[in-house]
């Protein structure tokens, strides 16, 4: 049976701007039917051990784990010193993840900057991940590479947004300390097949981002045409929605995961809405849907 966490997609800007604290997010997460709360490094005021212990204790007081850190490393920066800073930050974030009690740290390739040479950028990403591999192992933290769309704070979309590049990186870093974080909605945004990708990465899936998207004012073909532009940002026709109400067939996704024996974390990416109350209601509905899916495909939890 998977465990259920949530990432505060709808509250991200408020947390980054400190209109909501990480402790307030943990308190909100504790009101949902969750096993854990997902954090991002920029949610934290400090990486100092005493502060991290207080964050972990706050989660434990709400009956929550902090299983995963949603990091967005940018390994496609042409400046070697910038890539070095990204590597050193990631090393420290493995420690942060472990001190929070987590075992998973998301990694990415970086931004798809104009003018990048594909082969050279792939080598940068692969070299950075191989350098990080022994440090992840030492911390006991799995690097989980997400098939990603675009970080909220980035200018350009993900370099490895296409499945061809994403799989090339996973194949090149064939280590038990680099796993896949599967996000079906990001495959849709890339104009690719989310079910084919799942079958391809199934043996390496360690974590999953559960989100759902719907189209407003456009079609799948429009989205695929837009995905061919390597510099495109968020497509306005793609909207986040309550999980189970969008384009993903979650019965198909979870039956595939259950067949493989998957028992890792599934993290909700939702909480959109004009107010915190509406965002929380959407998170609650998404959590209820996912719990129902877990019961259906893995068997009902013991009371």
Question: What would you call each of these model-derived segments?
Answer:
Residues 3-4, 36-37, 69, 126-247, ...:
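Acidic/histidine-rich catalytic cores of soluble enzymes
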Residues 13-19, 40-53, 74-81, 112-116, ...:
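Acidic-and-aromatic substrate-binding clefts and catalytic sites of carbohydrate-active enzymes
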Residues 37-39, 67-69, 102-109, 142-147, ...:
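Short beta-strand segments at enzyme active-site cores
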Residues 106-122:
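Flexible, glycine-rich active-site loops centered on histidine and acidic residues
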Residues 245-259:
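A short, acidic, amphipathic alpha-helical segment used as a generic capping/interface helix at domain edges
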